[in-house]
């Protein structure tokens, strides 16, 4: 792997490059962590992963634009503070309430969370993951969760 490139698909078979990382700038563990996220937030916009592809030594993530990313009251920036994972409620009606955030030593620690359907949320116990994102604007990974068996609509 040499580079990871995000492309935006416009729905008409056109693909525009959005952002690129090289292996010399980020580690391979971060390459993998990013590929496991359902959503990508950058420059105030939200993108949804629709395809994860391999092209020789290159990793390609194809995204669809979901419009402006709506900020919530308890968001904070983790830039310069190391690697962090936030756990938030999946319900818009609850303003995607922050449950807790944990620091991670490496992206391998993040990958452990991203691979799971059920996770232990510190202080809340086991919860079901509904989606994952990397928020480039705030420098944090976010896992949206619900109580096991709970409907995630709303």
Predicted regions span which residues?
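Short, basic/aromatic beta-hairpin or loop at an interaction surface
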Residues: 3-21, 84-100
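Surface-exposed beta-loop interaction hotspot
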Residues: 52-105
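Short, well-ordered loop/turn sites that connect or cap secondary structure elements
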Residues: 31-35, 111-114
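Short beta-strand-centered aromatic/proline hotspots
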Residues: 45-56, 125-136
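Short alpha-helix capping/helix-loop boundary micro-motifs
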Residues: 20-29, 100-109
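Short, solvent-exposed secondary-structure boundary/capping segments
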Residues: 56-65, 136-147
């Amino acid at each position: 792997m040499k580079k990871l490139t995000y492309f935006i698909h416009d729905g008409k078979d056109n693909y525009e490059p959005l952002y690129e990382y090289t292996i010399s700038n980020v580690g391979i563990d971060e390459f993998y962590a990013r590929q496991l996220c359902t959503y990508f937030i950058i420059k105030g916009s939200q993108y949804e992963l629709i395809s994860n592809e391999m092209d020789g030594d290159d990793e390609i993530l194809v995204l669809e634009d979901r419009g402006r990313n709506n900020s919530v009251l308890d968001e904070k920036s983790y830039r310069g503070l190391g690697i962090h994972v936030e756990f938030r409620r999946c319900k818009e009606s609850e303003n995607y309430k922050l449950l807790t955030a944990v620091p991670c030593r490496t992206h391998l620690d993040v990958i452990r969370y991203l691979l799971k359907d059920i996770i232990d949320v510190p202080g809340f116990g086991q919860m079901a993951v509904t989606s994952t994102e990397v928020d480039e604007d705030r420098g944090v990974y976010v896992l949206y969760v619900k109580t096991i068996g709970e409907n995630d609509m709303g």
